[in-house]
């Protein structure tokens, strides 16, 4: 076992007598989830499950609404990634109404979206993931949080984290009316243009975000890559490793693009096996969703291979759509600093003997901070574009119909698919969100980590946190992912007295 995953400091490994270990609630993720680990008679892991016990149901209650409301409604899917849903939904509405936005509008949307990426990746790396690396997997539970990270790295760095994330939020607010649940997008364009004063303010904040992106990549190099234990953790095939298919979006030159481009699926050995056409409108040729009775979250798979269960490898249709996936699919970045980090990333793994895609789940964290830097650089580029203050920001729409919007959300490839009648009323909605793409892989990762770490009845808080690290790398957003109802919805209403005791429990199963 990788030494850093063994008992650290006050983390005490003890023998359990339980054959069922439940981690509930899970920590440092968006939404609710739990992990169930089942031990065999020898105290080793027989199976483990990543479960999402919450339901949101957005697909159903979008039906019957005016279709042009959906980019405002679906942004309520989540308070962490409303920008991704809003922009993707707006792209779907362009298609629904048969309109292509002006170039200035496209650039303003992307400008907004790059700020969203910066905010999201900063939030995940520093608030959710960093504690596992800065403090260590086995650090005391009470310290494994953002306050513990700030205590370890210092108030000055903590201040920079808060400042630059707030800059990203302020840019979204300036462009979108508000940072959370924005209203920038309308079918055929954007709601408003920006003036030179606003552009200059955005440029100044973008410059700070670029510097912070550079700092974050250097911090990752110093804290993680230069620590042999952490490097061993990343490249440990026994704990955090799966050979899967990968999905990502690239531009016409094969370079990374979050807002627009072709969606490309590659095999575990790196060959291109599918490319979405017509703006992703043929996505249903390539991906499908499977349901299992123990989760409200669907399981995506690569349709030409098919659903073979929760197994990895070339013969399984399970694929990943994450920052790791995007760096496997893309030929590089269009911005210089991110491209330099991209070359360092792949060069490091080549030196470690990796040929083809990088399959190490923990490398997703490295990929994410590289993407943060790219988003900041692209944010700066767009803020300096002479066309960004143009006044032609909307084209007229046509009669409503059917439309698909697709882009790269921070957590993976996102699809919004709407059908409307001639009156513009929504008759069907399909959402394939980043986390749904990764539901199968997260289950695989949790099971593999648990199997590798829990042996002979021996368990500790640090080891269970190391199991949680398996899903944390994916940055799951469970509010987004549990948007539909695959089966029944059991519900308990618990009525309590003033002293907290239970007076009555009313159950239903419908």
Over which residues does each language-model region extend?
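Low-complexity, glycine/alanine/valine/leucine- and proline-rich hydrophobic stretches
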Residues: 410, 417-437
């Amino acid at each position: 076992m990788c030494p850093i995953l063994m008992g650290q400091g006050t983390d005490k490994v003890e023998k359990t007598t339980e054959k069922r270990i439940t981690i509930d609630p899970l920590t440092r993720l968006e939404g609710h989830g739990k992990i169930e680990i089942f031990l065999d008679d020898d105290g080793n892991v027989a199976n483990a499950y990543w479960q999402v016990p919450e339901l949101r149901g957005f697909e159903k209650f979008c039906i019957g609404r005016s279709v042009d409301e959906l980019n405002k409604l679906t942004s309520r899917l989540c308070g962490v990634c409303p920008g991704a849903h809003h922009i993707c939904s707006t792209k779907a509405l362009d298609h629904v109404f048969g309109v292509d936005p002006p170039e200035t509008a496209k650039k303003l949307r992307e400008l907004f979206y790059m700020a969203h990426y910066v905010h999201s990746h900063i939030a995940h790396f520093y608030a959710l993931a960093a504690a596992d690396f800065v403090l260590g997997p086995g650090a005391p539970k009470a310290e494994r949080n953002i306050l513990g990270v700030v205590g370890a790295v210092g108030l000055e760095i903590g201040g920079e984290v808060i400042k630059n994330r707030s800059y990203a939020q302020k840019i979204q607010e300036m462009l979108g009316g508000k940072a959370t649940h924005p209203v920038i997008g309308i079918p055929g364009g954007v709601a408003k243009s920006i003036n030179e004063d606003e552009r200059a303010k955005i440029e100044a904040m973008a410059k700070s975000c670029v510097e912070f992106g550079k700092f974050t990549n250097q911090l990752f190099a110093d804290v993680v890559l230069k620590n042999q234990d952490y490097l061993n953790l990343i490249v440990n095939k026994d704990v955090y490793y799966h050979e899967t298919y990968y999905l990502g979006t690239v531009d016409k030159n094969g370079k990374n693009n979050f807002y627009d481009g072709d969606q490309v699926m590659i095999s575990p050995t790196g060959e291109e096996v599918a490319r979405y056409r017509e703006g992703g409108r043929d996505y249903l040729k390539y991906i499908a969703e499977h349901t299992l009775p123990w989760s409200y979250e669907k399981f995506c798979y690569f349709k030409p291979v098919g659903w073979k269960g929760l197994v990895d490898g070339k013969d399984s249709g399970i694929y990943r759509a994450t920052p790791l996936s995007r760096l496997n699919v893309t030929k590089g970045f269009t911005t210089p600093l991110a491209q330099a980090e991209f070359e360092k990333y792949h060069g490091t793994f080549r030196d470690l003997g990796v040929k083809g895609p990088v399959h190490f789940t923990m490398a997703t964290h490295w990929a994410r901070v590289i993407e943060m830097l790219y988003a900041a650089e692209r944010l700066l580029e767009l803020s300096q574009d002479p066309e960004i203050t143009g006044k032609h920001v909307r084209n007229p729409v046509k009669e409503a119909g059917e439309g698909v919007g697709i882009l790269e959300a921070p957590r993976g490839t996102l699809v919004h698919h709407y059908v409307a009648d001639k009156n513009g009323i929504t008759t069907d909605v399909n959402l394939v969100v980043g986390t749904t793409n990764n539901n199968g892989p997260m289950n695989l990762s949790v099971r593999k980590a648990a199997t590798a770490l829990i042996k002979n009845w021996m368990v500790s808080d640090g080891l269970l946190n190391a199991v949680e690290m398996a899903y944390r790398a994916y940055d799951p957003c469970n509010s987004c992912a549990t948007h539909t109802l695959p089966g029944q919805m059991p519900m308990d209403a618990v009525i309590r007295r003033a002293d907290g005791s239970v007076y009555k429990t009313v159950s239903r199963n419908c």
